[in-house]
Curated annotation (Swiss-Prot):
Name of the protein in its database record: Centriole, cilia and spindle-associated protein
Gene Ontology molecular function: microtubule binding
Keywords for the protein's UniProt record, in alphabetical order: Cell cycle, Cell division, Cell projection, Cilium, Cytoplasm, Cytoskeleton, Developmental protein, Microtubule, Mitosis, Repeat
Species this chain originates from: Danio rerio (Zebrafish)
InterPro entries: CSAP
Keyword Cell division recorded: yes
Gene: ccsap
Polar residues: bias regions: 54-65, 137-146
Family named by the database record: Belongs to the CCSAP family.
GO cellular component: axon; axoneme; centriole; centrosome; ciliary basal body; ciliary transition zone; cilium; mitotic spindle
Motif (ST]-E-Y-X(3)-F motif 2): 252-258
Location within or outside the cell: Cytoplasm, Cytoskeleton, Microtubule organizing center, Centrosome, Centriole; Cytoplasm, Cytoskeleton, Spindle; Cytoplasm, Cytoskeleton; Cytoplasm, Cytoskeleton, Cilium basal body
Amino acid sequence: MVTKRIRSEYMKKFKDPKWDTYAKCYEDLLKYRLSRRLLEQAHKPWFWGEWGSETASSGKSTPLSRNKVEPLKTLDEKPERSACVTPEPAAEAETQAAEVQDREHADTNLVPCDAEVAHPEGEEVRGKERSPAVNPDSDTQIQNMSKSKRRSSHKYTRSKVKPQAPKDPDKENRHPFALYGAGEKQTDMASKKTHNVGPAASTAEIHESALRAKTRREVEKQIKRFDKQRARSADLEKSRNKIIPDFNPWMTEYMRCFSARSR
């Protein structure tokens, strides 16, 4: 079954523009856009053909301004200056190295007798460092220190653990909602934490007014639920019994879908 395409009044009146009528306008706009592009890029022209060949050879697209070659004069002048300047620091370094060597030779000629005298003392010191004397008192002190550290660490960890507060059995047995007669009973709230406070009275001491209020709320909830169900069923019946009206030429699509007149 082929469905017939419904055409609105707008679709009948306004059709797609024909190419014959708007071809010249389109070409004029295209020419204008190209001329504007040339004007905007006049300060820095971009040659598309050269750019493509460069990317094919090098693999990177770089603007032409960066590829400019500097004049050869500056390149020739720089190495000449460096050639003139470089030998001076090299000569200075050679003279300094020669002076340092002469000083070292003079010092070595004067030092040997002092080194011979100091040599045995150095050997004794090294021997002491290699074989330190075992002192029993120091060993016992070290052991005692390690034990005391362990004990202190155990004490610190124990102090961190907080003791669990004992549960209040009266609080568990209390009624879930605040009671009307709770204000009449004096309670010692100074010793208790005030957050999440439950009622002071037990379930045996609930006032009759509180129970009546509870039953009233439950009845109201049931009535509301019943009303919602009735409204839902009434809407379904209306939609079923709704008669589809005949075609009305004066009723627009908006009125048919969203207006209250059609309902």
